[in-house]
Amino acid sequence: MTTSSYFLLVALGLLLYLCQSSFGTEHTCEPGASPHPQGKCRPELAEFHETMCEVEESLQGGTDDARKKRGRASLLRKRRGFLSMLKARAKRNEASPLPRAGRGIVCECCKNSCTYEEITEYCPPVTEGSG
Protein backbone atom coordinates (compact mmCIF):
# COMPACT_ATOMS: atom_id res chain seq x y z
CA MET A 1 0.00 0.00 0.00
CA THR A 2 1.41 3.38 -0.95
CA THR A 3 1.72 6.28 1.46
CA SER A 4 -1.03 8.28 -0.25
CA SER A 5 -3.43 5.30 -0.09
CA TYR A 6 -2.64 4.82 3.59
CA PHE A 7 -3.19 8.54 4.26
CA LEU A 8 -6.51 8.45 2.38
CA LEU A 9 -7.65 5.41 4.37
CA VAL A 10 -6.79 7.09 7.70
CA ALA A 11 -8.51 10.33 6.64
CA LEU A 12 -11.64 8.41 5.63
CA GLY A 13 -11.67 6.56 8.95
CA LEU A 14 -11.33 9.82 10.88
CA LEU A 15 -14.13 11.41 8.85
CA LEU A 16 -16.45 8.47 9.55
CA TYR A 17 -15.64 8.65 13.26
CA LEU A 18 -16.43 12.38 13.37
CA CYS A 19 -19.72 11.91 11.51
CA GLN A 20 -20.78 9.10 13.82
CA SER A 21 -19.93 11.02 16.98
CA SER A 22 -21.65 14.24 15.88
CA PHE A 23 -24.80 12.70 14.39
CA GLY A 24 -25.32 9.90 16.90
CA THR A 25 -26.66 12.10 19.68
CA GLU A 26 -29.94 10.26 20.28
CA HIS A 27 -31.12 10.09 23.87
CA THR A 28 -30.92 6.70 25.54
CA CYS A 29 -32.21 5.69 28.95
CA GLU A 30 -31.13 3.15 31.47
CA PRO A 31 -33.80 1.31 33.46
CA GLY A 32 -34.56 3.24 36.64
CA ALA A 33 -32.97 6.48 35.41
CA SER A 34 -34.18 9.55 37.27
CA PRO A 35 -35.99 12.39 35.45
CA HIS A 36 -33.95 15.27 34.04
CA PRO A 37 -34.33 18.56 35.99
CA GLN A 38 -35.72 20.26 32.85
CA GLY A 39 -37.60 17.16 31.69
CA LYS A 40 -41.39 17.02 31.44
CA CYS A 41 -43.09 13.96 32.92
CA ARG A 42 -46.60 12.52 33.26
CA PRO A 43 -49.43 15.11 32.89
CA GLU A 44 -46.96 17.87 32.10
CA LEU A 45 -45.51 15.73 29.28
CA ALA A 46 -48.98 15.01 27.86
CA GLU A 47 -49.89 18.72 27.91
CA PHE A 48 -46.54 19.71 26.36
CA HIS A 49 -46.88 17.04 23.65
CA GLU A 50 -50.42 18.13 22.80
CA THR A 51 -49.43 21.80 22.61
CA MET A 52 -46.39 21.13 20.44
CA CYS A 53 -48.44 18.93 18.08
CA GLU A 54 -50.98 21.74 17.72
CA VAL A 55 -48.18 24.21 16.98
CA GLU A 56 -46.71 21.80 14.42
CA GLU A 57 -50.14 21.32 12.83
CA SER A 58 -50.67 25.07 12.49
CA LEU A 59 -47.16 25.52 11.05
CA GLN A 60 -47.88 22.85 8.44
CA GLY A 61 -50.99 24.61 7.18
CA GLY A 62 -53.68 23.70 9.69
CA THR A 63 -55.98 26.43 10.97
CA ASP A 64 -57.09 27.32 14.47
CA ASP A 65 -60.75 27.93 13.45
CA ALA A 66 -61.88 24.31 13.75
CA ARG A 67 -59.99 23.92 17.02
CA LYS A 68 -61.74 26.97 18.49
CA LYS A 69 -65.13 25.56 17.45
CA ARG A 70 -64.39 22.16 18.99
CA GLY A 71 -63.47 23.80 22.28
CA ARG A 72 -61.85 22.32 25.36
CA ALA A 73 -63.82 19.04 25.21
CA SER A 74 -61.91 17.98 22.10
CA LEU A 75 -58.59 18.67 23.79
CA LEU A 76 -59.62 16.55 26.77
CA ARG A 77 -60.64 13.69 24.46
CA LYS A 78 -57.29 13.89 22.67
CA ARG A 79 -55.43 13.88 25.98
CA ARG A 80 -57.41 10.90 27.27
CA GLY A 81 -56.73 9.05 24.03
CA PHE A 82 -53.02 9.85 24.24
CA LEU A 83 -52.81 8.76 27.88
CA SER A 84 -54.72 5.53 27.24
CA MET A 85 -52.38 4.81 24.31
CA LEU A 86 -49.37 5.33 26.58
CA LYS A 87 -50.90 3.05 29.24
CA ALA A 88 -51.59 0.31 26.69
CA ARG A 89 -48.06 0.60 25.32
CA ALA A 90 -46.62 0.40 28.84
CA LYS A 91 -48.62 -2.78 29.55
CA ARG A 92 -47.37 -4.36 26.31
CA ASN A 93 -43.79 -3.45 27.15
CA GLU A 94 -44.09 -4.90 30.68
CA ALA A 95 -45.39 -8.19 29.28
CA SER A 96 -42.70 -8.39 26.62
CA PRO A 97 -39.72 -10.59 27.53
CA LEU A 98 -37.53 -8.70 25.05
CA PRO A 99 -35.46 -5.76 26.32
CA ARG A 100 -36.75 -2.33 25.31
CA ALA A 101 -34.69 -0.10 23.06
CA GLY A 102 -34.47 2.65 25.71
CA ARG A 103 -35.76 5.34 23.38
CA GLY A 104 -39.23 6.86 23.40
CA ILE A 105 -41.10 10.00 24.34
CA VAL A 106 -40.58 9.41 28.08
CA CYS A 107 -36.87 8.75 27.56
CA GLU A 108 -36.42 11.77 25.33
CA CYS A 109 -38.59 14.28 27.21
CA CYS A 110 -38.77 13.11 30.85
CA LYS A 111 -35.51 11.29 31.52
CA ASN A 112 -33.79 13.85 29.25
CA SER A 113 -34.78 17.33 28.12
CA CYS A 114 -36.22 17.14 24.60
CA THR A 115 -36.19 19.66 21.80
CA TYR A 116 -39.12 20.82 19.69
CA GLU A 117 -37.99 18.53 16.85
CA GLU A 118 -37.76 15.51 19.16
CA ILE A 119 -41.23 15.89 20.69
CA THR A 120 -42.92 16.60 17.35
CA GLU A 121 -41.58 13.27 16.04
CA TYR A 122 -44.31 11.72 18.22
CA CYS A 123 -47.14 13.83 16.74
CA PRO A 124 -49.66 12.18 14.42
CA PRO A 125 -49.15 13.06 10.76
CA VAL A 126 -50.99 16.18 9.63
CA THR A 127 -53.64 15.46 7.00
CA GLU A 128 -55.62 17.91 4.88
CA GLY A 129 -58.76 17.43 6.97
CA SER A 130 -57.03 17.79 10.35
CA GLY A 131 -56.94 21.60 10.25
UniProtKB/Swiss-Prot annotation:
GO terms for biological process: glucose metabolic process. Disulfide bonds join 29-107, 41-110, 53-123, 109-114. Expressed by the venom gland. Residues 1-24 form the signal peptide. It is found in: Secreted. Residues 59-92 form a propeptide. This is Con-Ins Q1. It comes from Conus quercinus.
